[in-house]
């Protein structure tokens, strides 16, 4: 298990702020069981696995955004259904 450095991660992310945001969201996905790791876990904590994935170029905002996309319903969908039944 090699150490992960910030410099390794910054090769795949624009700046440190984006690195922190990306790593924290990915670590939360791994910790809650929402997603499977793309690298062997090797008895690491979720934050370390997230940083290793970023350094390897396996995770970017496209991977994170897939979980954040939520199917949207119209704001007044329930009201519209009730009014259609009344007609």
Curated annotation (Swiss-Prot):
Gene3D superfamilies: 3.90.940.10
Keyword Signal among UniProt keywords: no
Top EC class of this enzyme: transferase
Keyword field contains Membrane: no
Highest taxon, organism lineage: Bacteria
InterPro entries: DNA-dir_RNA_pol_omega (IPR003716), Pol_omega/Rpo6/RPB6 (IPR006110), RPB6/omega-like_sf (IPR036161)
Record field: catalytic activity: RNA(n) + a ribonucleoside 5'-triphosphate = RNA(n+1) + diphosphate
SMART domains: RNA_pol_Rpb6 (SM01409)
SUPFAM superfamilies, per the entry: RPB6/omega subunit-like
Enzyme Commission no: 2.7.7.6
Keywords for this protein: DNA-directed RNA polymerase, Nucleotidyltransferase, Transcription, Transferase
Gene Ontology annotations for the cellular component aspect, listed alphabetically: DNA-directed RNA polymerase complex
GO process terms (BP): DNA-templated transcription
GO MF annotation, one: DNA binding
Role played: Promotes RNA polymerase assembly. Latches the N- and C-terminal regions of the beta' subunit thereby facilitating its interaction with the beta and alpha subunits.
PANTHER family with a match to the protein in the record: DNA-DIRECTED RNA POLYMERASE SUBUNIT OMEGA (PTHR34476:SF1)
Subunit structure: The RNAP catalytic core consists of 2 alpha, 1 beta, 1 beta' and 1 omega subunit. When a sigma factor is associated with the core the holoenzyme is formed, which can initiate transcription.
Annotated family: Belongs to the RNA polymerase subunit omega family.
NCBIfam families (alphabetical): rpoZ
Protein name as it appears in the record: DNA-directed RNA polymerase subunit omega
Native source organism of the sequence: Azotobacter vinelandii (strain DJ / ATCC BAA-1303)
GN (gene name): rpoZ
